[in-house]
């Protein structure tokens, strides 16, 4: 039985949270000030190590190797990546054939 069909969806009876463990993920994060002003854009990559009730744990590779990074548990935000070499604009690193990509916007709270 195939684990994934061509659309990237899990095969019948296989939960997506199980399928993504061990998969290579590129994470894009854009940070904004509380007023919507752009701060910075970061890109990270690594392998999914666990899917928790509220988060997904990713063991980062490359310049951030060894760090565990958590993203919200929204499996719909994990998009099947097309095969190829991806260049991370923020670091210049090359990632070959990632399994998934995901993008997040983070708005910082106003200062106290």
PLM regions with names:
Residues 1-112:
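Short beta-rich binding modules
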